[in-house]
């Protein structure tokens, strides 16, 4: 039975895809048969044939070296670098939760450890027409616990605590925090980490520095964060 985790962030451009690549790479190198999944990707380039290249998936695939097909990584790929609900309104098709679930099941049937990345932060709207679907609806539907990705620098305390408190109020379990763009020995960043841990009660799972190609975390400890998925 496959195991899964959801990767959310305190906002856009926090580095979730980069962290996802590190997680998948770490598991792959430990022989865990990992995979990657994302409900919707925005801001993608077109191939010469006019089709859209799922950029986040392409990065994770190349960075981690996994053999998973790009087509299986994301059911909804948009060109505009907008929130998925808006990109879908202009480009179509709108996101269908059952399609997302079906894609997730398909990946989980073929791989052992599946990392699902969110779009933006946990409050990101995926569809906003006759139906209202937010990212948290996907997380609840799939029954996934989450890892929170945050910046190590100035302003992160507020963003981390707000996200953690919101997820707690919504019944969305968090396993811990990974801090990106960390500078060892930086007084402010070290205090940021300590304050975030104190104010949220969440463990710091790892810190990631610019250009890291390996996660400073034991592969077995990482694998233990993933929980059995309910298909």
Q: Which residues does each predicted region cover?
A:
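N-terminal phosphate/diphosphate-binding loop that engages ATP/GTP or pyrophosphate donors
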Residues: 4, 18-94, 98, 103-106
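Hydrophobic anchor at the start of a short beta-strand
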Residues: 33-34, 114, 146, 174-175
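Switch II (G3) loop of P-loop NTPases
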Residues: 100, 104-131
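Hydrophobic anchor at the beta1->P-loop junction of P-loop NTPases
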Residues: 7
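Charged helix-capping and loop-helix junction motifs
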Residues: 128-136, 161-164, 189-194
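Inter-motif core of Ras-like GTPase G domains
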Residues: 128-152
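C-terminal lobe/tail of nucleotide-utilizing enzymes
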Residues: 165-231
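Conserved glycine(s) of the Walker
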Residues: 14-15
């Amino acid at each position: 039975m496959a195991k899964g985790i959801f990767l959310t962030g305190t906002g856009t451009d926090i580095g979730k895809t980069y962290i996802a690549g590190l997680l998948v790479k770490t598991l792959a190198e430990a022989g865990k048969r990992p995979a990657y999944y994302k409900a919707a990707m925005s801001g993608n380039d077109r191939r010469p044939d006019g089709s859209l290249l799922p950029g986040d998936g392409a990065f994770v695939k190349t960075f981690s070296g996994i053999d998973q097909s790009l087509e299986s990584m994301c059911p909804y790929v948009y060109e505009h670098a907008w929130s998925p609900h808006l990109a879908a309104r202009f480009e179509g098709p709108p996101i269908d939760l059952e399609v997302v679930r079906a894609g997730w099941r398909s990946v989980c049937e073929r791989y052992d450890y599946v990392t699902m990345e969110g779009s933006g932060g946990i409050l990101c709207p995926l569809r906003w027409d006759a139906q209202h679907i937010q990212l948290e609806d996907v997380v609840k539907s799939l029954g996934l616990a989450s890892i929170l990705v945050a910046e190590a620098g100035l302003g992160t305390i507020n963003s981390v605590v707000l996200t953690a408190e919101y997820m707690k109020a919504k019944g969305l379990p968090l396993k811990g925090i990974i801090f990106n763009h960390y500078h060892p020995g930086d007084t402010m960043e070290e205090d940021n980490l300590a304050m975030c841990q104190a104010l949220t009660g969440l463990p710091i799972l790892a810190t990631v520095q610019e250009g890291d190609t390996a996660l400073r975390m034991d592969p077995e400890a990482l694998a233990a964060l993933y929980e059995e998925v309910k298909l």
